[in-house]
Amino acid sequence: MSVSAHAAQKMPAPSSAMMRPVMILAGGTGGHIFPGLAVAKVLRARGVPVTWLGADDAMETRLVPQHDIPIDTLAISGLRGKGVVKLLGAPVRVMRAVRAAGFVLRKRRPRAVISFGGFAAGPGGLAARLLGAPLLVHEQNRAPGMTNKVLSRFARRVLTGFPGSFAGEEAVGNPVRAEIAALPAPADRLVGRTGPVRVLVLGGSQGARALNQAVPTALAALGHPEVELRHQCGEKLRAEAEAAYLQAGVNASVEPFIADMAAAYAWADLVVCRAGASTLAELCAAGVGSVLVPFAAAVDDHQTRNAEYLVGADAAVLLKQDDSLAVRLQQVLQTLLADPTRRLSMANAARTLAKPDAAERIADIILQEAGSGDGQPPAVQERAGLGIRNKQTHKQGSMQTSVNGDRSAQLIATNPQSRLPNPGASAGGAP
């Protein structure tokens, strides 16, 4: 078993005298972590404690403690792209991770568990199911990740950022920062503007080399139109981006990071960016039109699926990342830079897709399930393809867990002491 804990001094394992926390499973990328942090902020504002389960040495171990949220971590990593030998050993590693996650759940005794995706979410969600903690899933992308696909089969509620990800989903949206959701309507910002067209290019925290190359080339080919340009490029690619604009003879403000994204969106007439779920949620909340260039290597091409949702509402233009990107970007910019009416129409269309209260809605649903649950599994149910079910028995008031008849998969002991205690009960033999 490998479990480590951060910020344990800030919040000890809950006792019967304390309110039981909500556990968030999220990690690996900002796309999973930041929605979890947004929901955690809402829950804590309501007086609900939050605890986090992540993976060793992953991004969440640096970000989550900054918010004074206790985090436990598992020794787990992704399986995609691994060699045959490592894949053959994966079941053993997953079983160990589920066992370790069960240890954490018995220690933290969460009143509900929600997965936003990431390496630790799989073992954490399976342990929650086996121990009877109410489990929810929030999927940010239109093309669901592997972990949430599995967990969705036996989660109590399946929440999504975009419609069309799962059957029986609840499309609540992706959480965005309050200051972005509070921006004035597009017409209040854009109508009557004079001067150069303001273009905001977002490469994300890691930068986007394709945008670093295509945007300067496209603008130079347009004959240096009257444009005011801000390009967020990430720290690692800053020198490369500055050199590309210098070579193209295009003036641009190149920034590795933008601290005030609300002000940046309010400033922009048009955004050129990738199509991550959180970025698109911000574009909609702000109400700004965009040219979307999905990351070509994204898992299951999920960024293209995300972008298609905005394109279908006439809120964005989609360009594929390939060798002709600069030429096609030049053509699109030539049209949009000269057409303020089209830009305003795209901005209004984006705003109609916004779900600015997503974090509040997710928190509401978590607490609905936490309030209705007693720390025991829900009624017998089985979702297609997984074969996991919970059977209620009356012997000593315990629950018997069956996993497709395979006792080797029963990683969490099924005696009454191993289950999450009922509210108000003592922690019993929990470590």
Swiss-Prot record:
Reaction(s) this enzyme catalyzes, per UniProt: di-trans,octa-cis-undecaprenyl diphospho-N-acetyl-alpha-D-muramoyl-L-alanyl-D-glutamyl-meso-2,6-diaminopimeloyl-D-alanyl-D-alanine + UDP-N-acetyl-alpha-D-glucosamine = di-trans,octa-cis-undecaprenyl diphospho-[N-acetyl-alpha-D-glucosaminyl-(1->4)]-N-acetyl-alpha-D-muramoyl-L-alanyl-D-glutamyl-meso-2,6-diaminopimeloyl-D-alanyl-D-alanine + UDP + H(+)
Chain spans, region Disordered: 370-431
Keyword Signal: no
Feature: compositional bias, Polar residues: 395-420
Pfam families, per the entry: Glyco_tran_28_C, Glyco_transf_28
Membrane topology, as annotated: Peripheral membrane protein
Main location as per UniProt: membrane
Keywords assigned by UniProt, alphabetized: Cell cycle, Cell division, Cell inner membrane, Cell membrane, Cell shape, Cell wall biogenesis/degradation, Glycosyltransferase, Membrane, Peptidoglycan synthesis, Transferase
Example of a GO cellular component annotation carried by this entry: plasma membrane
Binding site for UDP-N-acetyl-alpha-D-glucosamine: T29, G30, G31, N141, R177, S205, I258, Q303
Signal sequence, renumbered to the chain: none
Broad enzyme group: transferase
Molecular function GO terms recorded: UDP-N-acetyl-D-glucosamine:N-acetylmuramoyl-L-alanyl-D-glutamyl-meso-2,6-diaminopimelyl-D-alanyl-D-alanine-diphosphoundecaprenol 4-beta-N-acetylglucosaminlytransferase activity; undecaprenyldiphospho-muramoylpentapeptide beta-N-acetylglucosaminyltransferase activity
Keyword Lyase attached: no
Subcellular location: Cell inner membrane
InterPro entries found in the cross-reference section: GlcNAc_MurG, Glyco_trans_28_C, GlycoTrans_28_N
Superkingdom of source: Bacteria
EC nos: 2.4.1.227
Gene Ontology terms describing biological process: carbohydrate metabolic process; cell division; cell wall organization; lipid glycosylation; peptidoglycan biosynthetic process; regulation of cell shape
Pathway membership, UniProt: Cell wall biogenesis; peptidoglycan biosynthesis
HAMAP family xrefs: MurG
Purpose of the protein: Cell wall formation. Catalyzes the transfer of a GlcNAc subunit on undecaprenyl-pyrophosphoryl-MurNAc-pentapeptide (lipid intermediate I) to form undecaprenyl-pyrophosphoryl-MurNAc-(pentapeptide)GlcNAc (lipid intermediate II).
Family membership noted in the UniProt record: Belongs to the glycosyltransferase 28 family. MurG subfamily.
Protein name per its UniProtKB record: UDP-N-acetylglucosamine--N-acetylmuramyl-(pentapeptide) pyrophosphoryl-undecaprenol N-acetylglucosamine transferase
Organism listed in the record: Xanthomonas euvesicatoria pv. vesicatoria (strain 85-10)
Organism classification: Bacteria, Pseudomonadati, Pseudomonadota, Gammaproteobacteria, Lysobacterales
